[in-house]
Amino acid sequence: MFKKVSKNANRLSRHQRVRNKITGTPERPRLNVYRSLTNIYVQLIDDVAGKTLVAASSLDKEIKDQVSATGNAEAAKLVGQLVGKRALEKGIDTVTFDRGGNIYHGRIQALAEGAREAGLKF
């Protein structure tokens, strides 16, 4: 008999499997994405030093002023552009994309496209 496993449990197991394979370095940090129901958060993380190099979210004033709702693909694309701009200011142009176990679709895809438009390579 099959057991029903929640979507979140599946996402967490995907995330653990991916995190065992990728790490962020100072030259190529990990672009980590956390998606909640109402917002999206992004960090560039150096796993060697355990430091967050750059962060952006849909709660930033620059994003909130431009969009009416923060939990949609439009806001995610703006967050991607913002994190890309901040990363380039710090001299970071290549990253490793960690989608946090989420499927590459919708808000996650929009965020990645926005970061690529801003100049990040992954």
Swiss-Prot record:
Function, in words: This is one of the proteins that bind and probably mediate the attachment of the 5S RNA into the large ribosomal subunit, where it forms part of the central protuberance.
SUPFAM superfamilies: Translational machinery components (SSF53137)
Top-level taxonomic group: Bacteria
Protein name: Large ribosomal subunit protein uL18
CDD domains: Ribosomal_L18_L5e
Keyword set, alphabetical order: Ribonucleoprotein, Ribosomal protein, RNA-binding, rRNA-binding
Region (Disordered): 1-20
Residues forming coiled coils: none
Entry-linked Pfam families: Ribosomal_L18p
Known partners and oligomeric status: Part of the 50S ribosomal subunit; part of the 5S rRNA/L5/L18/L25 subcomplex. Contacts the 5S and 23S rRNAs.
Gene Ontology biological process: translation
GO MF term set: 5S rRNA binding; structural constituent of ribosome
Keyword rRNA-binding: yes
This protein's GO CC annotations: cytosolic large ribosomal subunit
Family statement drawn from the similarity comment of this UniProt entry: Belongs to the universal ribosomal protein uL18 family.
Transmembrane segments: none
